Amino acid sequence: MRVIGLTGGIATGKSTFAALLRARGAPVVDADALARAAVEPGTPALAEIARTFGAEVLRPDGALDRKALGARVFADPGARRRLEAITHPAVRLAMREETARLAAQGHPLAFYDTPLLYEVGLEALLDAVVVVWAPRDVQRERLMRRDGLGGAEADARLAAQLPVDEKAARADFVVENAGAPEALAGKADRLLADLRGGRGRRLPNAPPVRY
């Protein structure tokens, strides 16, 4: 089974596109949900986090206190690397297990929906990457309208992310979503046809396939 990464930027329409893929019978796995499950109470990863960072990163019920952990690692690159050394292998194991489950069901391909695909280095585990892209001014306008933000707030949120143009430059497939949402349906059909037909990683120095 082929494993395809699906990512994008804030307000580019990735979630809408993921829903279109699901509606067409393609499994779309929420990679963030896998990451949360990997550090649930009773998991080896959570036990290692507590040993590394102390019991203060746990809530009274034994669950991970994400706010407390975030405060520990936000401004400390060394602490962040120690955390990633624990969580990344756990997430990769969860991905392999989910991939095996879907393959056993006979699916020829599956998508992993993850906003931070490039930021956490997941592309090495994937057969291809799809980026849902929109111009920055469109992202900004959508973000302001969707979340009721002012321009400065929207700009700050966009600045906190890896630019979607950079993600698109690294992708194998780019789904352009600057227009009306209904235009995405045909693009989902074309992407699935290409992937089911065997299209995958682009050649070095070749541009991504754009829809």
From Swiss-Prot:
ATP binds at A11, T12, G13, K14, S15, T16. The keyword Protein biosynthesis does not apply. Its EC number is 2.7.1.24. It catalyses: 3'-dephospho-CoA + ATP = ADP + CoA + H(+). It is an enzyme of class 2 (transferase). Pathway: Cofactor biosynthesis; coenzyme A biosynthesis; CoA from (R)-pantothenate: step 5/5. It is found in: Cytoplasm. InterPro entries: Depp_CoAkinase, P-loop_NTPase. Residues 3-206 form the DPCK domain. The keyword Electron transport does not apply. One of its GO terms (biological process) is coenzyme A biosynthetic process. Keywords: ATP-binding, Coenzyme A biosynthesis, Cytoplasm, Kinase, Nucleotide-binding, Transferase. PROSITE patterns: DPCK. One of its GO terms (molecular function) is ATP binding. GO terms for cellular component: cytoplasm. Its main location: cytoplasm. It holds the Pfam family CoaE. It comes from the Bacteria. Belongs to the CoaE family. Catalyzes the phosphorylation of the 3'-hydroxyl group of dephosphocoenzyme A to form coenzyme A. This is Dephospho-CoA kinase. It comes from Anaeromyxobacter dehalogenans (strain 2CP-C).
